[in-house]
Curated annotation (Swiss-Prot):
Belongs to the peptidase S54 family. Pfam families: Rhomboid, Rhomboid_N. This is Rhomboid protease GlpG. One of its GO terms (biological process) is proteolysis. The gene is glpG. Its EC number is 3.4.21.105. InterPro entries: GlpG_N_sf (IPR038236), Peptidase_S54_GlpG_N (IPR022732), Peptidase_S54_rhomboid_dom (IPR022764), Rhomboid-like_sf (IPR035952), Rhomboid_protease_GlpG (IPR023662). It is found in: Cell inner membrane. It catalyses: Cleaves type-1 transmembrane domains using a catalytic dyad composed of serine and histidine that are contributed by different transmembrane domains. The chain crosses the membrane at residues 94-114, 142-162, 168-188, 193-213, 229-249, 250-270. It comes from Pectobacterium atrosepticum (strain SCRI 1043 / ATCC BAA-672) (Erwinia carotovora subsp. atroseptica). The active site is at residues 201, 254.
């Protein structure tokens, strides 16, 4: 038997043990002070465990690990563990880009409350006629939010989806998805309603499409989104077209972002699912 790692959070350690059990690998978890040590019985499986552990440590709160605990019926570690604050949980799941966008978006929202929407939009709104060479505008409109509910809803989804993408695929991949979807969704919305709009929702819908389809095409991968959540997202999108919610919604941005995410996920998984 060989010691694999010691984790300070036994609940996360149990999640990894349960996940590896679904991969036909048995790990033994032993309490050691305030930590949980993981031991491997079959040393021939060490490389497989180390590879899975590396991915797990990038995104330990990914829903697939919780699903593994439900599948194996093991949710109680039997070990006393320290509690983590909301801030620690937030940082644990998110990478630097995820957190940076959240901080900047919140700062822009506060500035809008202090100086007024118009003054901030003068600098950050999608480019109007004659402003096309102000290149930041093609992306900065995603930072604009017009109500507390608007910003909370978008940042929650950005963290929930963008964090795992950055942890698993890297900051570069999340940056590409964010920039491409902001550009395309902004253009689509401006074509339909002019330049007076803002919000991260086009990027969020791109992440929804990307994570969901990637999980469907790579069931054994490390990114997934429950179909029930995807169904909710689609219902929300449809509701926006019927004005059921009683608020102004950037429907074109949502649709464009979703299409961008689906296309990027299809492209990224095409060679894996269709080997030559």
């Amino acid at each position: 038997m060989i010691r694999v790692i010691a984790l300070s959070n036994p609940r996360l350690a149990q999640a990894f043990v349960d996940y590896m059990r679904t991969q036909q690998v048995h790990l033994d978890m032993r309490p050691q002070g305030h930590e949980a040590e993981l031991w491997l019985e079959d040393e021939t499986q060490l490389s497989k465990v180390q590879e899975a552990l590396e991915i797990f440590l990038r995104d330990p709160t990914n829903p697939r690990y919780l699903a593994a605990s439900w599948q194996t019926g093991s949710m109680d570690t039997g070990i006393q563990y320290q509690r983590y604050s909301y801030l620690q949980t937030l940082k644990q799941k998110a990478g630097p880009l995820t957190l940076s966008v959240m901080v900047v978006t919140i700062a822009v929202f506060i500035l809008m409350q202090i100086s007024g929407y118009e003054s901030v939009m003068t600098w950050l709104a999608f480019p109007a006629e004659g402003q096309q060479l102000q290149l930041w505008r093609w992306f900065s409109h995603a930072l604009l939010h017009f109500s507390l509910l608007h910003i909370l809803f978008n940042l929650m989804w950005w963290w929930y989806l963008g964090g795992p993408v950055e942890k698993v695929l890297g900051t570069g991949k999340l940056l590409v998805i964010a920039l491409v979807s902001a550009l395309v969704s902004g253009w689509a919305q401006s074509w339909c309603s002019g330049t007076y709009f803002g919000g991260l929702s086009g990027v969020v819908y791109a992440l929804m499409g990307y994570v969901w389809l990637r999980g469907e095409r790579e069931p054994d991968g490390y990114l997934s989104m429950p179909r029930s959540l995807m169904a909710f997202a689609l219902l929300w999108l449809v509701a926006g077209y019927f004005d059921i919610l009683g608020m102004s919604i950037a429907n074109a941005a949502h649709v464009a972002g979703l299409i961008v995410g689906l296309l990027m996920a299809f492209w990224d998984t095409y060679n894996k699912t269709n080997p030559r």
